[in-house]
Amino acid sequence: MHDIEYIRQNSEEFEKAMESRGMKEFSAEEILKVDHKKRLLTTKLQDLNRQRNEITKKIKELKMSKSPCEKQIKSSKNITNEIEAISLKEQMEKDKLVNILSNLPNIPVQGVPIGAGENSNLEVRRYREKRQFDFVPKSHYELGERLGLMDFEQAAKISGSRFAILKGQLAKLGRALINFMLEMHVNEFGYTEVYHPVLVKNEAMYNVGQLPKFSDDSYLTTDELRLIPTGEVVLTNSVADKIVEEKKLPIRFTAYSECFRKEAGSAGQSTRGMIRQHQFGKVELVSITTEDQSNDELERMTGVAEEILKRLELPYRVILLCSGDMGFAAQKTYDIEVWLPEQNRYREISSCSNCGNFQARRMNAKYSLEANKKVKKYVHTLNGSALAIGRTIIAVMENYQNPDGSITIPNVLQKYISNGTVISK
């Protein structure tokens, strides 16, 4: 949610920011008109309430002196009726303003490349040389099906398209990755592990910017609960409607979450197998910070996600997203892309974003200053995948495959799989 005062004072700058987010020929005029109308009604209400209070005081004085007060009582009733009518109009304008602002994305911070799509993204760094194969590398789905450990056909019979069943050593590999990631985040980087619901209210989705704009992308149950598209929804909402002491920030949470999205993706090689699923597992990171901490926290969070790939010895690159390619709530985002040999390209495996106070305004999350506890400011929120489990499985399978179709288990994971070293038939 945007600060209306900022829009009043910086309408042209705000328009440019929205245009950089892909809203062509955006104008702040409608926002300012609705805001002006609402403010006039608010001023009128304040004046009427003042008049009614004065009349009420006068009525009390007249009654105490046993003087006639019918005229004042009638006047008070008329003002009350007028207040009720104007209050309804004011609420309508408030709702209209909130609806407009709720559908507008966050403003990019300085340093974010301005552009419409991925061609304007900026590569920041790379890690590790790509493995040179002396055979033609196979895809993860070909490897998995040949091993008899990955079943898309039966999953489709049970649940439809875009689902997968993993069995045996591949299922263990997924569990090993979850344990490895969570233990690293908790034991080495100070995150608090959270076990949380996967069904949430619409309000929780609204707070993080998933609603109203992306309503059709999530699964809605018959009792108006939604399956989470990311663990960020629950972890970020942990501070909704709260005031946190500044000295307790930053707060860092991590959780393994089953996530659900309706996206079907486009047909073709890039979406075959487990690349884009309706249900997928993800280890999430969320940080709640002061406004002064969030920039450094984004760098730290991205570094934590990178550390997983470094320990798995997987080639990757870090991309700074341009203004038109960022998520709705983000003001700055780094994507981490892992190398997939069979596809001969990098694919996203993590996205780490600083949302500033955008989500905090929607969910009314603040912190009290240590120097003056009466002063409250909106917290800053950050979120990142560290990492998407399915895509990490894919990356391990494709980068660690052997000529016979077996898969070498990365050293760092072997202790989680009974010291196994190879996945084979």
From Swiss-Prot:
Reactions accelerated catalytically: tRNA(Ser) + L-serine + ATP = L-seryl-tRNA(Ser) + AMP + diphosphate + H(+); tRNA(Sec) + L-serine + ATP = L-seryl-tRNA(Sec) + AMP + diphosphate + H(+)
Protein's organism: Wolbachia sp. subsp. Brugia malayi (strain TRS)
Keyword Hydrolase: no
Keyword Iron-sulfur tagged: no
Assigned protein family: Belongs to the class-II aminoacyl-tRNA synthetase family. Type-1 seryl-tRNA synthetase subfamily.
Job of this protein: Catalyzes the attachment of serine to tRNA(Ser). Is also able to aminoacylate tRNA(Sec) with serine, to form the misacylated tRNA L-seryl-tRNA(Sec), which will be further converted into selenocysteinyl-tRNA(Sec).
CDD domains given in the database record: SerRS_core
Domain of life according to the entry: Bacteria
GO cellular component terms, A-Z: cytoplasm
Pfam families given in the database record: Seryl_tRNA_N, tRNA-synt_2b
HAMAP family noted in UniProt: Ser_tRNA_synth_type1
Annotated compartments: Cytoplasm
Keywords for the protein's UniProt record, in alphabetical order: Aminoacyl-tRNA synthetase, ATP-binding, Cytoplasm, Ligase, Nucleotide-binding, Protein biosynthesis
Biochemical pathway: Aminoacyl-tRNA biosynthesis; selenocysteinyl-tRNA(Sec) biosynthesis; L-seryl-tRNA(Sec) from L-serine and tRNA(Sec): step 1/1
Domain notes: Consists of two distinct domains, a catalytic core and a N-terminal extension that is involved in tRNA binding.
Assembly notes: Homodimer. The tRNA molecule binds across the dimer.
Name of this chain's protein: Serine--tRNA ligase
Residues the entry annotates as binding L-serine: T230, G231, E232, E284, S385
GO MF entries: ATP binding; serine-tRNA ligase activity
Enzyme class, first EC level, given as a word: ligase
Example of a GO biological process term: seryl-tRNA aminoacylation
UniProt EC number: 6.1.1.11
